[in-house]
Amino acid sequence: MMKKILRITALCIVLVSLLTFCGKSKIETKEDRPVFLEQVSTTAVAQLYADGFEQLSLNEKILAYYLAQAVIAGERIDYDQSHRHALEIKDILEEIVTHKEGIDPEIYQSILDYTKLFWIDHCQYNSRTKIKFVPTCPFDEFLLAAHAAQKNGAEFDLKENETLEQKLKKLEKTIFDPKFEPLVTAKTPPPGQDILTASANNFYAPNVTLKDLEGFKEKYSLNSRVSKENGKVKELVWRTGNQDFPAGLYHTELSEVIANLRLALPYASEQQKATLKHMIDYFETGDPDSFRKANISWLKDDSTVDFIIGFIENYKDSRGMKGEWEGVISYVNQKTTQMMKDLAANAQYFENKAPWKDEYKKTHTQIPVANSIDVVNAGGHAGPRIPAGINLPNEQEIRENYGSKSVLLHNVMRDARGVTGGKTSQEFLETAEEKKLAQKYGSLTVNVIIAMHEVIGHGSGKVSPKLTEDPSFYLQEYYNTLEEARADLMALWNLFDPKLIELQILPDEDAARTGYILEAMGDLTMLRRIKTGDRIEDDHMRAGHLIQAYLEKKILAVETFRKGGKAYRRVKDFNLFREGVGELLAEIMRIKAEGDLEAAKKLVNTYAIKIDPALRNEVIERCQKIHYPDFIAFVVPELSLVKDESGKISDVKISYPLDLMDQQLKWAGKK
């Protein structure tokens, strides 16, 4: 819904992954239900459960159903935004895996695994590392499999006089060559390229360069593709069009989105109706003002069922401008929401104690909306890899004048733990005391840090009045990294505040110490995700690495050491750690508030990007030995309408597919 709305926190990514994977057998949780479903390459696939959905009112259930359908209706948009050939490749893969008779089983499994990763990432690039992945089978075997599928009735949308071999040959490098367009997002491009030409995403035509955009003012910066024809740069707006506006890109998909939003209207609260109407207008016209009105209206609502739908996050765009399609449909978990409420009620307290200058401190005119939620559907950029925490909107002007909303995704965290355990602490923490603390406090501290990241991290601070644009305009491709680091640091800064014990959010200071221990270890285990090279491209990973490298190299509060032939990382001095956090937090807030691009560039380039390949290789090997996945992807619940004899909706049934392939093929209309 909002510009830069969904912040998938760096600490969320690092800390959730600290709760280690327990192997390849199915893990049973409540009612002996399966959570872990399978492992595809280094990604674990889990079933997400939405306990309590049945207790919602009928209107709330129906609202959730139609909103979920709206999210699914936009799925193909995210594929096309990710790469110009992603939809074509997706359709080819789905035709092969649904027409498998006669295909060599080993080759079929290779193609199926690649297809599952393609579904998870909405393209041939890992959505977190930004690095391209390729099939394990050779092109010739892939071609044979496609021919077998064609004989079985698979349709490959061939052009007139085009053969299947010709079609696949055109895509060979795109699918099989890891060195061809190696990164979907390249913020540190190689010599001779810029951040646009080195990035494979489809937000810009391949012939558009960064120089082309000098002096070019985008009217639809969040919701348009930039093209260049006859040397002239122009925007192709994402909208359906109406009597006053011509149809734009994705008009077919957005028309279906709008149709479902209209069906949701009768079941929405009055405030939600206002928000949905603004959203519908936005999808029709592309007008940024309608988008802004939707944001402000949405912030006024604190209903049980809530939603994020639209062009949201801009992480995939190296410029940090274009919003990726995504959606999250949820409801409040009344049993676990008190912590979020308590943090929100004390937002001004934490703001006042922030280590930055008073001129950058925000006055909270009202208590921010904050909840613990259970997710019933997540798609686009927000799924199947689902974030653990959300704060929105991130547009500074709206945040300062209208506030923000924060949520902790309770069932995502819970079911992530259904495929994780304590093996990371056993492998990567060196002392018995550290391991004991991690076992005792780890899960609790992770939740608290993520909650603070959202409520008092992203929701804090104000910028200098001399800034006439959003701070992201001034800080360019460095903004997202620094904003994620700022929210992480705000959580770490306040972890030892006695207010948390007073509010019974943390039991004691040992729980706070555990947070610092896990932060130090988390950056070490994060290295397993970067399989090649010596640079980090993802903003969330950069943010966590920036903090760790700063504390280790400049503050000397953390050290990496070896014992028994293994690398470990430990906190040398907890007080010094917190002092360093405060120092870095104050500087990043100053950079944001003043729009100091040169300082942003220096900080990120010095601490956030480079890694040690030898250390990375060791971490990968150790993680493989304990069956520790790089990521977790979720199969979300499925909702279906139940109607009585007269055709009236009498209920909404919730079910659990337990199968990634089954769900993705249904969403694609192929099952």
Say what each PLM segment does.
Residues 19-21:
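C-terminal motif of bacterial Sec signal peptides marking the signal peptidase cleavage site
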Residues 29-92:
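N-terminal-proximal low-complexity accessory segments that begin disordered
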Residues 461-485:
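Post-HEXXH active-site segment of zinc metalloproteases
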Residues 49, 78, 492-591:
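Long, well-structured alpha-helical subdomains associated
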Residues 115-233, 239-436, 442:
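Contiguous, non-catalytic segments that form substrate-binding/exosite surfaces or channel walls
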